[in-house]
Regions:
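Short glycine/serine/threonine-biased micro-segments
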Residues: 4, 80, 103, 217, ...
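AAA+ P-loop NTPase catalytic core and its hallmark functional loops
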Residues: 1, 7-8, 12-203, 207
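Conserved AAA+ ATPase small/helical "lid" subdomain
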Residues: 188, 194-250
Length: 256
């Protein structure tokens, strides 16, 4: 059991593939090859990992849990592996999310991994080669990853600079799956499925997204993601006038 109960149907129906990414990810999982998801914000990277956790669990008839960590500039290696905490009886060690995933098996997903501090890279390197081990210096312990463990990371290449980028020594430990904005036809289906609006409105929103993305070559710094188009559709579905829905969900979200 994944603990999804009420949302299991939602997870099952929530991802529409754009290429062979499901087959590639499943193969990587079977062969214990770490996966790097790269692409712009709002192109479905997180949704894809959620779906694959469900998909692989269904195929294997056993739970393959997903442990997601939203990386940020203050995230340290200790946040991932664990730390000592003080309680009434003294100090005790509490495993971090990465350690729990390594021990019990499952997918550990580090979202926007380049945002984390550099010491986190040192931690994940031994987990992403033939060793598949996690070393916890504070405990003096070395853990071999469970057979069902897989490391998955994501990042947005468009946001990176010389100070925040994935080193080649890190990149080449992963197979990479690229996520791009879907075709207008597919995006129409996604918007319709996710927001519940009819095909005509979904098509108009997909067309709007495509036109806005063409403006990124003319000074617009951020493209309209599929996510914000879905948000606009949800507002329209709930009775907000279409132009206003697009203004608050799309225009004001990507411009200042």
């Amino acid at each position: 059991s994944l603990g999804l109960v009420g949302s299991e149907m939602c997870i099952r129906d929530s991802y529409i593939p754009t290429s062979d990414e499901i087959k590639v990810f499943e193969s990587a999982y079977n062969q214990k090859v770490p996966v790097l998801l790269k692409g712009p914000t709002g192109t479905g990277k997180t949704r894809f990992v959620e779906y694959m956790s469900w998909y692989i669990s269904e195929k294997r008839k056993k739970s393959v849990p997903l442990v997601t960590v939203a990386c940020h500039e203050d995230l340290t290696a200790s946040d991932l592996v664990g730390r000592y905490l003080i309680d009434a009886s003294g100090t005790k060690w509490i495993d971090g999310p990465l350690t729990r995933a390594v021990k019990s098996g499952g997918i550990c997903y580090l979202d926007e991994v380049v945002e984390a501090r550099k010491d986190t890279t040192v931690i994940i390197h031994p987990l992403t080669d033939h060793r598949r081990i996690l070393t916890i210096d504070k405990l003096g312990e070395v853990y071999e990853a469970d057979d069902d463990f897989l490391m998955v990371v994501s990042y947005n290449p468009g946001y990176q600079n010389a100070l925040k980028d994935l080193k080649q020594s890190t990149r080449q430990r992963f197979v990479a799956i690229e996520f791009e904005f879907p075709s207008p036809e597919l995006e129409t289906k996604i918007i319709q499925s996710e927001s519940g609006v009819d095909e005509k409105i979904s098509d108009s929103l997909a067309s709007l997204g495509e036109k806005i993305r063409n403006l990124t070559d003319h000074g617009l710094t951020e493209a309209a993601s599929t996510r914000v188009l879905i948000y606009a559709g949800k507002l329209i579905k709930d009775g907000i006038e279409p132009r206003r829905a697009c203004q608050v969900a799309v225009t004001w979200g990507i411009t200042d």
